[in-house]
Amino acid sequence: MNIHNAVNRALEVLEYLASRKQPATLTEICQHLDAPKTSMNPIIYTLLARKFIIYDPASDTYALGSALYKIGNEYLEKFDILKYVRRVMDDIVSICSETCYFATLDGPNVNYLLKADSTEKIRMVSSIGTTFPAYATALGKCMLIQYSIDEIEQLYPEGLKPLTPKTITNFNVLMKELSDVKHKGFACDDEESYLDVQCRAVPICRNGAVIASLSISTPAFRFTSRKEELILKTLLQKKSVIEQTLNDSQVDLSVLL
């Protein structure tokens, strides 16, 4: 079956805007997609009319629109397992007062499905839909433990690129870290994806296979030994709760695959 070029191009525009931290000009969009403005204009106008993107005349830039938010919420509402996990995450935040994430693996990257915000004024700002290479995050390390070094090298043919000076960039060092994750039952991100941010995560398994991961992130200045102890205790407890539900029920897990 052939891909419809115009539809595919519209989706590429949305993916590009989602990948950016800031809105983009039409020139930037066209340069990224290697497309002329004449062919992009009808696509942009259609996305604007349907509210999939918005336009800011003051900065002459485009950003994601409310239609995507609505569709995303409706999508999540259809999956009881995500609603259940979200309730567990809210409980985690009430205990630890830090930001909680639930994610799956999408090729070489972490796919953030859910986020429960910290109650603190200073908190994490990563959004749903953000992607990070799995090797640089605690969430990702939890899901890479099932991979061999050959498989991981295939995931990252250009090597392990640093996001911060503390990112692991050596495959052998990463494999040692993943072995430690298997042994300890949790993974660490010690300022490897963001400077001044600490993260701890646990794998979520069903029938012995890792299908997702759950994490708590906190600014480094709040990450005391007592805070880490509370975070790990809470994550491991809630991991058991979620896994029991997954293993005891016939829930549809297609959203996690």
Where would I find each of the regions flagged by the language model?
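Short, highly charged C-terminal tails/helix-capping segments
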Residues: D248-L257
